[in-house]
Amino acid sequence: MNQPGQPGVPVADWAQRLGWRMAWNVPDNVLDQLPGAPFHNYRRRSVPLLMAGFYQGMPGLAVHIRFSKKNSSPGSSHYSSSAGMYMNGASKTSKQVVTCGTVVLEMPSPVPELVVEEKRDKLGDIASLFDFNRSKNVVQGKGIDVGPASLNIYHVSGASPEYARAVVTPDRTRWLYNEGRGPAPNTTLGKVHFRLSGRKIIVWCGRNFEDPVVLDNLLGIAQEIQRWIPPAAYQDPAAAEADRQSIPLPQLQLPFV
């Protein structure tokens, strides 16, 4: 990706148009100020791009996270005539890059924690444990049963089941998933996930921000998800508790010049 100030950097033009600040290749420990998914999905990570500003009157943040994970597979076995037995070959390790484009909007009032993320395979979690891929949420726990709204794709966790089911409905997850393309009408986002945490609406997908249309769509999805929140959620004591777990966006220590 080109740097700001050079021709052909649409995301820099996008940031300038909205008055957002941006920083390239920032230290990954900036994410330590943002607990929970998706900022800590994998232990090995880098941050190629970070942006912050206001969107529709709300504090906003956009971050491209580049995770890397190791995949180990056993080597093939062969018969050794000298040993008179089958021998296992050396295991093979490959590296996989996982792109995560994330936007955050901060609402005026908090709501309880709710995470709608990809449903993971238990055997995959165990294999990932041996490869030291995850340092947090190493094994995905039991989720909230939202019935057909999960599409057998999403894992839902957080506060009360009643709250989760009020937000996560079959029509909404079908819209969000859209046969794996995501809900954007003008680009393919892939699988889209979200999290409500105190005042924060966090939305992420497997795209970076080379094409600013990804940013526009993720921010639009965040606004749509805000409309899904039932009024009772703002009165729930769990809302204030979730809000205490994170730093307000304007108070984050961000590496802007």
Residues covered by each model-derived region:
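Transmembrane-cytosolic junction motif
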Residues: 1-14
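Charged, low-complexity intrinsically disordered regions
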Residues: 11-257
